[in-house]
């Protein structure tokens, strides 16, 4: 077995089968001592391989062969002249070191480029041009009949399970619905549409559905993908003349999960294919789960017929977790990593990182790594020092009176209206929002917040926080207002 054969086995584990067959299998790698030449068939193919898979190829060859090596990327098939880019990786070379470019011409003075063969199967002008672009000939075409491993979609990640998803008021409805469809797919909430900002746990919930459904029914056919991969699969099925297989695979799923569905908006061919796929699955009682960064009606360029179908089932939101949930997320994450995190440090990070869960966990990792490297406990002082440029710690904390002023200006009412006894909706709702913001953005206790709003009882503040949290799940207008106010006050 050659070094490259060993590498292929490792690379295959890191890619979807379809991606592996489309991009990695067609290339040829020749080894001459420490020199590895990667033949990529044409310039476009070479650039794509190098930009998307270059680091994976380099690290895998280093793992199988050692660090002292040279990699050449050729834009030709395995013969004749070569135009190559050379990557040198020695014992002291940085993994992400700058590549040097070397032009080699080993075919005397000729610069003739061999034309790729065009499949006799296709009479389509578009397909022929795509063949010329990608450099595929008939021998490279992959069909389900020729290869049983031909597949679509993306692998589910085992780490995304319901047990590792921290539940709070901002996501409990979405989590409950996700659990229901994983146990009884196609029965309730079909489709299940989960929307919310980036990094708030939509992908986690979606993959948790797939992983749990597989535990409940190991024989279920579950396809997980995102809109980018769905588009790639569709385009590749056209290029490889295998649309029937694309349709057969996607329309035979028991559970179809598509992340970031908003990106199919404006892509007419893909949107139409998805429309028919949706109808086929829905009519057969198969479960569909979709995520998006926006409510269906707010996705610009999305066809009305798709918007209406997304409304067939249940639409739920995931919002930024409140302070208590953010603290719980940090403590659980630290525990999962086998690290001790003081409650006060978790509270400090949670109070200062309010963008999304992804950045919250990133801040935690930075604190834990810094403290471990410096052989110190992860104290507030350590967090303050290493996160200063990330969270832009302000010397003055947000004050309740500032929140009241911003909210009053936003809703065009007076600050004294917020502290008054008026109960009209145009006053009561902004007051509840201001209380909820005060609870999230300040360290004041419930009684202190109530006192700042005209001497109200702490139970009134609790009711306001719960009411606004619930409304943010179902009312996009209030949810958008809240996020906008949150950003204004946090600046």
Swiss-Prot record:
Residues 155-371 are annotated as: Domain III, AAA+ region. It comes from the Bacteria. It is found in: Cytoplasm. CDD domains: AAA (cd00009), Bac_DnaA_C (cd06571). ATP binds at residues 199, 201-203. Coiled coil: none annotated. Residues 1-69 are annotated as: Domain I, interacts with DnaA modulators. Residues 69-154 are annotated as: Domain II. One of its GO terms (biological process) is DNA replication initiation. InterPro entries: AAA+_ATPase, Chromosome_initiator_DnaA, Chromosome_initiator_DnaA-like, Chromosome_initiator_DnaA_CS, DnaA_C, DnaA_dom, DnaA_N_dom, DnaA_N_sf. Pfam families: Bac_DnaA, Bac_DnaA_C, DnaA_N. Residues 372-491 are annotated as: Domain IV, binds dsDNA. One of its GO terms (molecular function) is ATP hydrolysis activity. One of its GO terms (cellular component) is plasma membrane. Keywords: ATP-binding, Cytoplasm, DNA replication, DNA-binding, Lipid-binding, Nucleotide-binding. SMART domains: AAA (SM00382), Bac_DnaA_C (SM00760). Domain I is involved in oligomerization and binding regulators, domain II is flexibile and of varying length in different bacteria, domain III forms the AAA+ region, while domain IV binds dsDNA. HAMAP family: DnaA_bact. Oligomerizes as a right-handed, spiral filament on DNA at oriC. Belongs to the DnaA family. Plays an essential role in the initiation and regulation of chromosomal replication. ATP-DnaA binds to the origin of replication (oriC) to initiate formation of the DNA replication initiation complex once per cell cycle. Binds the DnaA box (a 9 base pair repeat at the origin) and separates the double-stranded (ds)DNA. Forms a right-handed helical filament on oriC DNA; dsDNA binds to the exterior of the filament while single-stranded (ss)DNA is stabiized in the filament's interior. PANTHER family: CHROMOSOMAL REPLICATION INITIATOR PROTEIN DNAA (PTHR30050:SF2). This is Chromosomal replication initiator protein DnaA. The gene is dnaA.
